[in-house]
Amino acid sequence: MQSFTREQVQETLEGKGYKYFTGGKYDVNIVGIRNSSTGDEITNKFDDTMTVSYKDEDGQWNYHEYKCTTDPGKYWAENIMNKDGVAIVKPGQYRGSHQVGLHQGKYKALCQRKPLKVYRDDNRDDHYDLDESSVQEGIFGINIHKAGKFVNGSTQIDKWSAGCQVFSKESDFNEFMELIHKAKDVWGNSFTYTLVDSSDIC
């Protein structure tokens, strides 16, 4: 997992013309950072970074980073569920895209409620094909959830993601959701998700 600063994330988003939330307490910025150093290789590892930045009750900035994947695992890249191919979220800012809900009816997570753009890769090789001609926009169940109950975190993505944004460690995810619930109490049940490439970080 690569590490960044809150200031880098803010500068990157604002440089792209995206909204960086600077309002009152728990006005959260949820930003996934996809590891560009691996290119289009399917690593099947949790080598991306989920970041959350916000002001606390005292108006002080807080910043958290978590190990995650923003890519589908090798299993679903080879065992495709959708005839058009496995889904890979396209970098961008998706305003109000997620709400607190039940992931697969099991536990609370951030669930997709508005359209996202995804690339579709259907050739089952060892690389993600990020072809603009394959891009689809819609509601595909791209949730933000956890891999499982592994104390030290899951090391391989495998079946944990067919396109979802997935935390490696349950404890990290639980901490994330505590922040989300605090934000929900203040701002309502609507969350913006932003995905950028690490090569875009200022």
Task: Specify the residue positions occupied by each region the protein language model found.
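Residues immediately within or flanking Cys/His clusters that coordinate Zn2+
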Residues: S161
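Cell-envelope and extracellular/periplasmic
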Residues: K169
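Cell wall/extracellular polymer interaction/catalysis modules
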Residues: M1-D158, D172-H181, W187-F191, S198-D200
